[in-house]
Regions:
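A short, well-structured edge-of-sheet supersecondary motif
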Residues: 39-64, 80-92
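N-terminal secretory signal peptides that target proteins for export/translocation
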Residues: 1-7
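Short, low-complexity intrinsically disordered segments enriched in A/P/G/S/L with frequent Arg
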Residues: 16, 62-74, 78-83
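A common structural microfeature
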Residues: 48-50, 95-97, 103, 123, ...
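Short active-site loop at a secondary-structure junction
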Residues: 91-111, 336
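Bacterial N-terminal signal peptides
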Residues: 10-24
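Conserved serine DD-peptidase/penicillin-binding transpeptidase domain
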Residues: 28-42, 98, 114-337
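Short N-terminal amphipathic alpha-helix/helix-capping patch enriched in small hydrophobics
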Residues: 31, 35, 47-49, 102-103, ...
Length: 337
């Protein structure tokens, strides 16, 4: 596959950082005519746009300076101060607050296509630490993630089916999840907009299951009295209010449910559900993100008829065992489509 020049890749990332950091730091300049023409053609008023185009900062340690004169005392001269950057080439409404746009993902997507290629697959590798006899694994089952960004319920079910199809029905041991492919700092789900339960606030993970999201499905019964509450994916060790009474209308159906997510193991709905809403889904970023994959894997394994004498636990850098099955992600081109 033909790849783009490396310097363009680096320039794209640097430009992203510059645009991110430089906003609000410059006096306004008029928009060039080609940009105003493009905005007019798209039906976008100039007042709805903010942009900054600025020179790239020099790489760390590459401060340009004149040759250092000799020092008779032999002492080291003090390092000169970095030179200020030239003014931005374009600064249109740099200080006007705007709703955040999905711009950063354009650069990460570009880098993924350039460095990995559109046909790249992530691999979730499953191995066994022990031996299999009469359908029972005497030992641990190891599931090692590689950062698959779209390991959703359907594909995790395919992986479980493949494990069972190769002859493991029960596990006399533990299921060990290894998400250690990334070295990540602690993630604060509330840092962006102080709403940590929004699914888009789930953090990255080397074994990210279902985008880190738990979905509650509200299904009114035919009798018109209650609505069933169904969770997807199935999760082990979590209690959820199984049904809620119905009320007239719909309106702010989430607010009327009286949801309590304060205890990740005991999720309550103490209000009512609008009968006129029909079936609705409510997705949240699971509050105890560090144990979400464990609970989902155990819930889906048991729901598939699998036995487990031990528990599901996370061990980063777990020693691999005998390869058993490998789950492939969708190709990169399909994931970003």
């Amino acid at each position: 596959m033909r790849r783009l020049p490396k310097f363009l890749s680096r320039a794209a990332l640097a430009a992203a950082a510059t645009l991110w950091l430089a906003g609000g730091a410059a006096a306004q300049t008029p928009l060039p005519s080609d940009i105003t023409d493009a905005l007019a053609k798209a039906g976008v008023p100039p007042q709805a746009v903010a942009m900054v185009v600025a020179p790239l900062p020099p790489p760390p340690g590459a401060v340009s300076r004149a040759p250092e004169p000799a020092n008779p005392s032999g002492e080291r001269n003090a390092a000169p101060a970095p030179q200020p950057l030239p003014p931005p080439r374009l600064a249109w409404q740099p200080d006007v607050p705007m709703n955040p746009a999905s711009v950063t993902k354009l650069f990460t997507t570009y880098m993924a296509l350039d460095q990995l290629g559109p046909g790249y697959f992530w691999k979730t590798r499953v191995s066994v630490q022990g031996f299999v006899k009469d359908g029972t694994l005497q030992g641990n089952l190891l599931v090692k993630g590689s950062g698959d960004p779209k390991l959703v319920v359907e594909r995790l079910q395919d992986l479980i089916n493949a494990i069972r199809a190769r002859g493991i029905r029960d596990i006399n041991g533990d299921i060990v999840l290894d998400d250690g492919i990334f070295r990540l700092p602690p993630h604060d789900a509330a840092a962006f907009d102080d709403d940590p339960l929004r699914p888009y606030n789930a953090g990255p993970d080397g074994l990210l299951v279902n985008f880190g999201a738990l979905v509650f499905k509200f299904q009114p019964d035919a009798g018109g009295r209650t609505a069933r509450v169904v969770t997807e994916p199935p999760v082990a060790g979590i209690e959820v209010t199984p049904e809620v009474p119905l009320a007239k209308g719909c309106g702010d159906w989430r607010g009327r449910l009286g949801a309590d997510f304060s205890d990740p193991l005991n999720i309550r709905f103490t209000g009512r559900y609008g009968a006129a809403c029909g079936e609705r889904d409510w997705a949240i970023a699971y509050p105890d993100a560090g144990h979400f994959a464990e609970r989902v894997f155990e819930g889906m394994w048991r729901a598939s008829g699998g036995g487990l004498s031990g528990r599901v636990r996370t061990q980063r850098g777990a020693p691999p065992g005998q390869p058993w099955v490998t789950g492939l992600s969708l190709p990169l081109a399909q994931i970003i489509a």
